[in-house]
Amino acid sequence: MLLIGYFAYKRTSNLTDYMLGGRSLGPAVTALSAGAADMSGWLLMGLPGAMFSTGLSGAWIVIGLCLGAWANWLYVAPRLRTYTEKAGNSITIPGFLENRFGDQTKLLRLFSGIVILVFFTFYVSSGMVSGGVLFNSILGMDYHTGLWIVTGVVVAYTLFGGFLAVSWTDFVQGIIMFAALILVPIVTFFHTGGAGDTVAEIRSVDPDMFNIFKGTSVLGIISLFAWGLGYFGQPHIIVRFMAITSVKEIKRARRIGMGWMILSAVGAVLTGLGGIAYYHQRGMTLKDPETIFIQLGNILFHPIITGFLISAILAAIMSTISSQLLVTSSSLVEDLYKSMFRRSASDKELVFLGRLAVLAVSIVALVLAWEKNNTILGLVSYAWAGFGASFGPVVLLSLFWKRMTKWGALAGMIVGAATVIIWANAGLSDFLYEMIPGFAASLLSVFFVSILTQAPSQAVTDQFNDYQDTMSQ
């Protein structure tokens, strides 16, 4: 990872290179880096653990995420890649929103930049906590030592190599994750007697393990499906669309990305189900279902291979941290410092400050992670919904609706974020996932406020028409 960071450093000469890789990513790197940045440790721990605990009824979230990711690639990716270049060659989402609506007040950039800065700092901190806990629980290493190792490696390649380093390392980490999720279920099924014996063993534990509706409700299924809506508003994922070489490569990237995601998710599901059969055959019990991937690795493989499997989990955690860290740095430098205080700042100054911002945000996140605070980990439970509801409808409508105004965009972001926070803190999330009311409220706010406020200027309308003409070619 550090070697990749060094090579990326040698190829980084200006702010666009540092924050967006000079829009030079190929389809494979774009696809796998987006996937690795998205999934984090949940793919190798949370999802197999859910399958081990509840069976296939936990798979609804996988279906929702796959549909959301597919729609994101199909409808958002080509349009965002085209429009960000038309709108002042924007290199951040807040910058795109300001340029898209010709916002001279800078409120859009300021508000969205602050939201990204605050929430992603906690998000990064939660990733650091996960890394420290992994070192502590698997290797018996002191939590704080593990924290320093994860933070040190991620900060080093992100700080020096910027977007290219993050994308290339995410690509490698995506391959490691994929290989691990194919290897573990295959070997597990081999040791449980093949597919037929494995299925029979699982049915002997609980015949309803294969009932996808077990313990679910209509609202529960809708809530799990709604996770897919979050993709439209995740800055660390959709920024990958802005960095691909050309719009023509997005179709290939979509196929690679969705293939990786679906096969990896299936591997995670089969790992959990295979774990049920393996443990039951041998009369074994497991205290923490989320460790089933790690435990199978320890039992079934040579220590060298086990080390590779553990590195896959670390790769998942690190890829998400680095992506979120860079987006946070970008907002701090491009959307707050340059936009508000130093519009004449040189690229050299901004790249230096970008690296400084990576270090500063990392230090703050490390301090927050030091005490292994459960409140920080709890924040992540609705941060996905917060970004999805505040940015998702705004990004979608900005790409499709000419009449949308800057005031509509601002209202959508504020109402979406506020609805998610209020809904979650009112204890209503068990009834319905906060993404749904947040997304709906944001969508309605954008529409009604845009209709009730002055239409976009002729310059903004002309830019939208130019973008539409390019898309139709």
Swiss-Prot record:
Gene that this polypeptide is encoded by: putP
One Pfam family linked to the record: SSF
Protein name according to UniProt: High-affinity proline transporter PutP
Cell compartment(s), UniProt: Cell membrane
GO MF annotations in UniProt: L-proline transmembrane transporter activity; proline:sodium symporter activity; sodium ion binding
Transmembrane segments: 32-52, 56-76, 114-134, 146-166, 171-191, 218-238, 256-276, 299-319, 350-370, 376-396, 408-428, 431-451
The keyword Hydrolase is assigned to this record: no
Effects seen without this gene: Deletion of the putBCP operon abolishes L-proline utilization.
